[in-house]
Amino acid sequence: MRAICVLSGGLDSAVTSLAAKFENYDITTVTFNYGQMALNQEIKSAKKISEILNADHHVIDINFVKEFSKSGLNTGEIPEPEKEDLDDFEKSEKTMKAVWVPARNMIMFSIASGFAEGIGAEKIFSGLNKEEGVTFPDNTPEFIERFNKSLEYGTLNKVKMVAPLYELNKPEIAKLGKELEVKLDLEVLKYSYSCYRDNGEDYLHCGTCESCMRRKRAFKEAGIVDPTKYLVE
């Protein structure tokens, strides 16, 4: 069995890739360059994780996206919410809009679908999850269902996107990741990179962007030692 894992190097996609490995898929990982500020760190992280999982790794250039994106992920204008803001829908929605990259997931998953069909892979593994689905419409079960419906018409081999984390929040994802590490006797989580910024040192997180805040909370609430180094704890 073959599968494509869309691997940004972040916690969600790292755990998703572990899940694909646990299911005995022959994995090929893809990382997308859409002009994001953290690109170099994401590639380093994804490459390292791919090596650990014995997966072929590819970087796919969709840098044209930054020509029309006003996202903070492209411009560097990254919001820094307070911890108590993470569960405030209105504030989280505002933060989401500040980092939203137009149609990013649609573009990435469409390309991943073509890649999957081309190499004869039957599934695309994505890190879409419940916590981000609260504010990001392209992280919801509805998005997954309708995207898969389009693949019935857009691919000949009827490749399917799966999201093993779609019912999980971040602490549950961290816990699952640790469990999979133990079962597979692999160490992956400490090499994952969630930060929206490139902080000039491999695997070093800023600790203040929303993604870092959610990562911190995930490990803490899961009762797992956080292997991450932060500029701001």
Swiss-Prot record:
<dbReference type="InterPro" id="IPR018317">
    <property type="entry name" value="QueC"/>
</dbReference>
<protein>
    <recommendedName>
        <fullName>7-cyano-7-deazaguanine synthase</fullName>
        <ecNumber>6.3.4.20</ecNumber>
    </recommendedName>
</protein>
<dbReference type="GO" id="GO:0008270">
    <property type="term" value="F:zinc ion binding"/>
</dbReference>
<dbReference type="GO" id="GO:0016879">
    <property type="term" value="F:ligase activity, forming carbon-nitrogen bonds"/>
</dbReference>
<feature type="binding site">
    <location>
        <position position="195"/>
    </location>
    <ligand>
        <name>Zn(2+)</name>
    </ligand>
</feature>
<feature type="binding site">
    <location>
        <begin position="7"/>
        <end position="17"/>
    </location>
    <ligand>
        <name>ATP</name>
    </ligand>
</feature>
<feature type="binding site">
    <location>
        <position position="209"/>
    </location>
    <ligand>
        <name>Zn(2+)</name>
    </ligand>
</feature>
<dbReference type="GO" id="GO:0005524">
    <property type="term" value="F:ATP binding"/>
</dbReference>
<keyword id="KW-0436">Ligase</keyword>
<keyword id="KW-0479">Metal-binding</keyword>
<dbReference type="Pfam" id="PF06508">
    <property type="entry name" value="QueC"/>
</dbReference>
<dbReference type="InterPro" id="IPR014729">
    <property type="entry name" value="Rossmann-like_a/b/a_fold"/>
</dbReference>
<comment type="similarity">
    <text>Belongs to the QueC family.</text>
</comment>
<feature type="binding site">
    <location>
        <position position="212"/>
    </location>
    <ligand>
        <name>Zn(2+)</name>
    </ligand>
</feature>
<comment type="pathway">
    <text>Purine metabolism; 7-cyano-7-deazaguanine biosynthesis.</text>
</comment>
<comment type="function">
    <text>Catalyzes the ATP-dependent conversion of 7-carboxy-7-deazaguanine (CDG) to 7-cyano-7-deazaguanine (preQ(0)).</text>
</comment>
<keyword id="KW-0547">Nucleotide-binding</keyword>
<keyword id="KW-0862">Zinc</keyword>
<feature type="binding site">
    <location>
        <position position="206"/>
    </location>
    <ligand>
        <name>Zn(2+)</name>
    </ligand>
</feature>
<keyword id="KW-0067">ATP-binding</keyword>
